[in-house]
From Swiss-Prot:
Function: Required for accurate and efficient protein synthesis under certain stress conditions. May act as a fidelity factor of the translation reaction, by catalyzing a one-codon backward translocation of tRNAs on improperly translocated ribosomes. Back-translocation proceeds from a post-translocation (POST) complex to a pre-translocation (PRE) complex, thus giving elongation factor G a second chance to translocate the tRNAs correctly. Binds to ribosomes in a GTP-dependent manner.
Protein name per UniProt: Elongation factor 4
The entry's keywords: Cell inner membrane, Cell membrane, GTP-binding, Hydrolase, Membrane, Nucleotide-binding, Protein biosynthesis
Enzyme Commission number: 3.6.5.n1
Lineage of the species this protein comes from: Bacteria, Pseudomonadati, Pseudomonadota, Alphaproteobacteria, Hyphomicrobiales
Family the entry assigns: Belongs to the TRAFAC class translation factor GTPase superfamily. Classic translation factor GTPase family. LepA subfamily.
Amino acid sequence: MARMSTNSTTPLSHIRNFSIVAHIDHGKSTLADRLIQTTGGLAEREMSEQVLDNMDIERERGITIKAQTVRLHYQANNGEKYILNLIDTPGHVDFAYEVSRSLSACEGSLLVVDASQGVEAQTLANVYQAIDNNHEIVTVLNKIDLPAAEPDRIKEQIEEVIGIDASEAVLISAKTGLGIPDVLEAIVHKLPAPKSPGGDKAPLKALLVDSWYDAYLGVMVLVRVIDGVLTKGQTVRMMGTDAKYQVERVGVLTPKMVNIDRLGPGEIGFITASIKEVADTRVGDTITEDKRPTAQALPGFKPAQPVVFCGLFPVDAADFEDLRAAMGKLRLNDASFSFEMESSAALGFGFRCGFLGLLHLEIIQERLEREFDLDLIATAPSVVYKMFMTDGTERELHNPADMPDVVKISEIHEPWIRATILTPDDYLGGILKLCQDRRGIQIELTYVGTRAMLTYDLPLNEVVFDFYDRLKSISKGYASFDYTLTDHREGNLVKMSILVNGEPVDALSMMVHRTAAEKRGRDMCEKLKELIPKHMFKIPIQAAIGGNVIARETISALRKDVTAKCYGGDATRKRKLLDKQKAGKKRMRQFGKVEIPQEAFIAALKMGDE
């Protein structure tokens, strides 16, 4: 690890803390790469595509999951030297929590918009978050080297949709490096310097921006110092958890780790302090000195609440302990992921996990499978329902299999979201129908040029299954979607169970709206009929609500031709053999177990993708 001695803290007027806000795939991480390259943060041989996206899965999917940070040294055209702290934030809706914490550590944002595609749904969500944090915003139009780029039209669109002046937008191509020096100048001259109400003599007050686990150093904590100075050897206290630690090292990321002696007001860097658990470092907490604490903590964040739940089970029961260890390791880096043990009659032992959203679920599952070499089955994703019982109590339901007796429930409330969908108007009809089918309530519909912007209220339950995939297929990939949770509303919801050979399969039970139950049940039974192989006896597959069967399919039995050896002769001989076979099958059906293959589970849970 390199060492850099900086005993004097940088004056506030020469520090700029900024983040980059953009929709997925508009070139945010590539721009970060170019800024690092231009300011000499890494030598040429150390550069790789998307330097700040450390996980393989981030590079492959081309998305940023964990917010990353880097400190750049820049000599401006006016001869002054500046320190620029860039926080690269995720763009996807599930990671909005990571975005909100990163934004509160900065004073300004670069709004990156693809000059060929224009404003997308997540651009809006993240820009509004930046504006809520009182950020100064510099607009950057990327990919202007593409033949399809229309910078003038996109500038008008930004002014119309977001309402910020884009006349002086910086035109760049992050891929070729065109216009990068203009971006650096704009950061220095247009974004404000950080403020420190108390200066470096005041008691220490620092914001905990992020924390991650390093195999050698333990938990590393990313901090933004507001007042006072953070030095090696200091005893610090986390005001939220009241935990005390001695600071072992102080440093900055360039993006390599570089040790320094102290962090002053306005600076962003990392500390390590023999912290064992990432859970001890709550993001958004205030760090202060134990001996001379600050009077007031910073306005705190809310801890991330899991929104979507699903069961994860190892395909091979022997992998259970490995799965537990792997989840513990992931939890070290991702405090928004929660899990607890559960068992299922069909799938054995596993975990009930909570996630921020569907992409978060997919990524955790993929990381478990890839980094820890596990084979997993995920049950149908479900949301958190609030149940008001007849005895006046209130309960939360995370797993449909745990639903109490219907007689004891007076009403069930489900979470609703406010969704923003941007789409070319050619696909508007199909998307309106999709939202209508999913019990959506239209709030508004506006046009921006040839694009329509839809605002809908939708039940989250209808979105977690396959809404995103359907939206993409209807719009041939052009529509973009973003949502925020709004409230819980009463719904006419029922628990639908699937029975195979008279036995309920707990992993396939789900909460559905009463109006959609019959269709959902029929589809599920038909799907399972295709996927479960024939057995030696007849297998009924039923969908039921309570004691009422609402759909049924039957898998016919495999039969051996027992009459093959009878040539001509008496018909009673054949009859006797057939009756004997029938009796055997009946007995078999009583005692036979139906094996449901893994593919059948997975396909049944992916219902509605056709």
